[in-house]
Amino acid sequence: MTESPQKRHLGQGIERQNEQYACQGALSTIGMRIRQSVDRGYQVSGAAPAPAARTAASCVQDNSELTIPDYKRVPMPSSKQAPMLVNSRTVSSSSSLEMWENQLDERLEHIDNDIMRNKRAFEQVEDW
């Protein structure tokens, strides 16, 4: 009873098949070799490149000089007025917090009046 438990293999293992092609063994490990190359940063065996060259080679190509032209800001003539930051289309003046509060007070008062009219006194209840 003091024996340590051991795992037993219940199934049958897959037998190694004969290679149909000479490179079949190399193809079976290509996924792992690709992952290792990516992990190493595509460094080829031999002398390691300089850090600056390694960084430049691993960066994505920068096309910002071609796609983003250099715009030069020209000052506005003094005869023209700067555009308004706020105008009638960006701000609505038809409503304000004060108007909303007044309407809220009126609505609450109307609700209170309706509730007071709908209440019945104890004597008016005929269900008893």
Swiss-Prot record:
Keywords: Cytoplasm, Nucleus. Mediates the nuclear localization of the ribonucleotide reductase. Pfam families: RNR_inhib. GO terms for cellular component: cytoplasm; nucleus. This is Damage-regulated import facilitator 1. It comes from Lachancea thermotolerans (strain ATCC 56472 / CBS 6340 / NRRL Y-8284) (Yeast). Belongs to the DIF1/spd1 family. The keyword Cytoplasm applies. InterPro entries: RNR_inhibitor (IPR013900). The gene is DIF1. It comes from the Eukaryota. It is found in: Cytoplasm; Nucleus. The keyword Nucleus applies. Its main location: cytoplasm.
